[in-house]
Amino acid sequence: MNGKTEETGPFFMHTRTAWGGRTARFLSACALALFLLIMAGLACSALGMTAKASIAMNYLNLSLDLVRDHVVPNLLLTAALLLVLAWLVCLTARFRWLWIALCAAWTVAAIGFVLGGGFTQRGDSCMIIWAAECFASGDYLPMQSEYFQGYSYQLGICFFLELIKRLFPSANLMLLMQCLNALLSAGIIAALTGVAVMLHRREGTEAASMLLFLAFVPFFLYTTYVYGTTPMLLLCACAMLCFTGYTHTRQKRLGLAYAVFLGLAMVLKPNALVPAIALFICAILYMLETGDRRLAAFALLSCVLCAALPAAVNRMYELRSGVPLGNDIALLPRLTMGLQDGETAAGWYNAYTEQFIGSQVTVEAEKAQAMRDLMTRLEEMRCDPGMTLAFFREKCLSQWIEPGYEIVWHGSICSKEGRFNGLANLVFREGETIRMLLDAYLNIFQQALYILILLGGVDTMRRREFRAEHAMIPVILIGGFLYHMLFEAKAQYSYPYVVMMLPLAARGLTMIGAGIRRIRKK
């Protein structure tokens, strides 16, 4: 070929795809290797340590302590839990109707839990609910608050809640959204189970995926949290399902749906940008692998929608209220805060960005101040490598090995005003027997889950499945892990990535189940 090929005709398509396929597989393999490295570190760390979340002295804040755990008992209990889960999958894999019924019962139980507990909200959730109720009644006073002037991206979830309030004007918006969270969570189970089945196609995958969701208690408890997390997760899960479906069928409607779902997810929560970028990368890998440019075009459309839809919502509220929005806090101050010591742990929120909220702060002044503080912090890190290593170690572990992902702490600080609030208090109140048992289970389950995710990745590597759709989950995790190692850390920020990795954990569980079946046949 003398290094030259024509850019038209089947021969060009073949040679370009052959070269592109090798490149795509190599990049996917590299992503999978890095993913395995991260998950191996998290799994080992979770076995030897845990991040204990408790109520701080001022009652509202989170106190987080990294404590050493007992490795041998943890290993034994984790192994026992893995065997029980795998045995259940082997026993019930053929009974699809049973798992559908169990998921329906789980949804009903979640609705009963939020109604019976009557969980109130704290912090950002209160502000968002209040603003949505005001907007639904034509009152735009919240637009004048410093909160929305500095965090205008929260208007996306406000818009969603406002629509719900307008549809059900006489309903309690908080309780209604909690019940809706239960229904949306059932949708997440369905979407990510579909992803697991399409990616792995192994007997028992569907049962394994549903079982892990039902056994993952934080997923159940997050129905009490009125925020953009659960709705965003559903839209991201649907985007992953459509993306995977397109790679199997090349149906254009799936590609379009993938782009739209991600755009809507970005409206609800800006954290959706990480899955959006990850799927964009995977779409490029798919184009290199197959020569199909359409998925890359849909990925580009998703990026446009991720930028345009939140801006459109903000502009709509500006026009409706007549109140112009200020500039959101930029990424540079957020990066600076993420590299500082936080109130809870290294890199967690410390109110550094609050100084930049207000009309008196110009963009230039914000950038200059944040850059000076960032340079000062980087110089401190350069001069003390030991401190730097300890900082990033604490930042990583504090957000990834907190077994409840902050939702148990959130439940403990919320008032319970429902008919069965006594039972809810028994579950969440520190020192209660049920709470101690819950903490112990969450700790063991997190260890088991990380091991299953690691096993799923190892099986993918072993089978040399380096296609773009198999790189999807590893790239999402890598993106989320690296982003929150630099920017603000929170255990609740890690939670969506853990949920999105459950299809890979299902693969790990079916591996163990297959091993059990082979032993039984002997």
Q: Across the structure, where does each feature detected by a protein language model lie?
A:
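Loop-to-helix entry region of an early transmembrane alpha helix in multi-pass inner-membrane enzymes
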Residues: 151, 155, 159, 167-187, ...
